[in-house]
Amino acid sequence: MIACHVIAIVSAFILDKWLGDPKWLPHPVVGMGKLITYFERRWNCGRWRREKGVLLLLTVLLIVTALSLALVWLSYQVHLLLGVIVEALLIASTIAAKGLKEAAEEVARPLATRNLLEARRKLSYIVGRDTDQLDEKEIARGAIETVAENTSDGVTAPLFYALIGGAPLALLYRATNTCDSMVGYKNERYRDFGWASAKFDDVLNWVPSRITGVLMLLLHRKRRQAPLGQSLKMLAREAKKHPSPNSGWGEAAMALLLHVTLGGTNTYQGMTSERAKMGYGTKAMTAKDIDESIAIMNRTVLGFLVFLFLLGGFIYAIT
């Protein structure tokens, strides 16, 4: 059974690299989004919003976990091969390496030819900030920050939970992440209602985000600005500057490896937001840096997969 579980994870990774998220295939996240919207419209009002937000999170996680457990269990009961196929498809739906790579490349291509209008438009699909006035450097920064943050959120974190608990736990992670992305804002409407989703998403991302940031530095020795020990200290110091307890690890590591500075001034619906800068680089970012961030992501994800199997093998050997 353990062998089937490992085969499902590897197959899921290959499926995502090959197919990504084809539009013709029903995606669990779409269902999660509809479920969250349904409960949010009914519960995000009146008193006890924080408590209702906790109820939203628990309800969504219970439904997603119960359905995935039942589907995986029934599939394995029919046949081991069917179980592996179903579990692989479910795990693949939680990771987005191909989608992230393609989205970043969609920004890099027009940026490389100085078509800033098209590059801004493509960037607006993957970031929440205003993009209509961004110059070449800021467009590249937006794409690089997206790749860096989502290397963990969109790829390594779901793989981490897939190793621990298979497709059901990977889907629980993705459901939490979806709740956070939909209601985990700090504005008046969601400050209380989205509190539980945001906090639980932080908890689930704490370990994989740090492993991902450290692996980025470990796997790219030639890109590091300093010896490993010093680089790790720089990583920890720079990551703390990010307002998120987890996103800073991937972004700080990427900034150190690309020799650029991430963070700074962003504008959201005309409102300026200042964020601490991470990294020590001074060069202006270009489309080439976006391509290099994708290469760093790909190598880090492969290294993370190897790390997970080594960790899993060690735990299996001592238990």
UniProtKB/Swiss-Prot annotation:
This is Cobalamin biosynthesis protein CobD. It comes from Halalkalibacterium halodurans (strain ATCC BAA-125 / DSM 18197 / FERM 7344 / JCM 9153 / C-125). GO terms for molecular function: ABC-type vitamin B12 transporter activity; threonine-phosphate decarboxylase activity. PANTHER family: COBALAMIN BIOSYNTHESIS PROTEIN CBIB. One of its GO terms (cellular component) is plasma membrane. Its main location: membrane. HAMAP family: CobD_CbiB (MF_00024). Keywords: Cell membrane, Cobalamin biosynthesis, Membrane, Transmembrane, Transmembrane helix.
